[in-house]
Amino acid sequence: MGYGYGAQYDSSDINSALDTGNRGFSEMLVPASDGLSGHGTAVASIAAGSRNSQSGGIAYESEIIAVALKRTGGSDGGYTRTIDIMEGIDYALRKAIELNMPIVINLSFGTNEGAHDGNTLFENYITDINGIWKNIVVVAAGNEGDSRHHVRTDVSSNINRTEFAIGDNEKNIRLFIWKYFQDEFEIYLNTPSGKRINISNDVTVSSQRENIESVLVMPTPYTSKQLVEVSIRPGNSLDYVISGIWSIEFAVTGTIKCGIVDMWLPTIEAIGLSTGFLRPSPDTTVTIPATARKVLSVGAFNQDAGSMATFSGRGYTADGRLVPLIAAYGVDVTAAGYGGGYVRKTGTSFAAPKISGYAACIMEWGIVRRNDENMYGEKLIAYMTRYAVGIEGEEMPGIRQGWGLI
């Protein structure tokens, strides 16, 4: 479709490869791309896997468009850029239009790289496709609820220092500091070795013990906020970042019109469990792009405990919108395993495809069977949230369960 890379395999190609009965030969015909984690396999099986005596997907007769995302750099398999995810969404949407079929786009992915207010290019793109074709975008809320990766502070108060711990064996720690452009103050990074570095502007500090780089990002056409992104890497003589207590210090230099500062560390998939803020803010921990507008953001319910999972990302967004909007079972979910068999998966990544499956069934009833050909997008979100069941002990609507459980 004009992307300049990749290959397309239809159902006949995939079935022919499976019919060989030889895994090595079948992967020569259709390369496997899910990696050893089996994340994509599990997600797809929960949403639309075939039914059998042990398990099965929700919308088990649905067609599946599986998009393997491009990886960039890195000897460990690299990483996926948000632009690659946007191209994957574009491909799926174009294919649905070509086939004249409604589509549920499931995104079991999340990042902390953004202000969490719906205004990144990534979030705006996902919001904008709501008006294209008969679709709904379902997004996992992320597993950052108890991760200690977010803190909110007010520089106009007496609290002007925020401490965070860096655990052992970290190779690179990135810290995202979002402030209002209208506020005037300087930002300092204090290291365990006693250095105090002004990171208010672009700066690079290299030594035997630590390498620090800060980048100041001014307001853009997409956001009026200001970002200071800090990268902490090992010193020239070390393999890992110095572990210990680091801190961010704020020094007011002029007018403070708001004073609120939000800071995020990377998600739990990127850093160790020992790394985090000492006094974290568990709210506003829903990951991007679940913070986009006009998407169905999904939290995880712990069916064993009878309550929302402690790891499930919490709202509100940084600009005060309710997220997540809905919840589904997200602990020990049965899913297809990579290479065969069944596995148990935990996380909002595996709650979201349950909602995607339910959405597909409702869209079939409405659009395919012509009971309501407008049953997609915001209308579908409205109906699903209306008939969700409130969780006992949770605020309704609330920043943990949204409008309730399906």
Indicate residue ranges for each PLM-predicted region.
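Edge beta-strands of jelly-roll/beta-sandwich modules across compartments, strongly enriched
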Residues: T255-T267
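Extracellular S/T/G-rich loop segment that most often corresponds to the catalytic His/Ser-adjacent loop
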Residues: Y3-N22, S147-L238, A251, L278-M363
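Short acidic, glycine-rich surface-loop motifs adjacent to enzyme active sites
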Residues: V67-L69, I89-D117, A140-A141, E249-T253, ...
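Hydrolase catalytic cores
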Residues: A44-A47, N52, I65-T72, L93-M101, ...
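Subtilisin-like serine protease catalytic core
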Residues: M1-I83, N100, E170-I173, Q182-F185, ...
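Catalytic cores of secreted or luminal carbohydrate-active enzymes
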Residues: V104-I105, F122-T153, G402-I406
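Hydrophobic, small-residue-rich alpha-helical packing segments that form membrane-like cores
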Residues: G40, G73, R81-E98, V104-G110, ...
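Structural recognition of the beta-strand scaffold that forms the well-ordered cores
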Residues: S45, G56-G57, E63-A68, I103-S108, ...
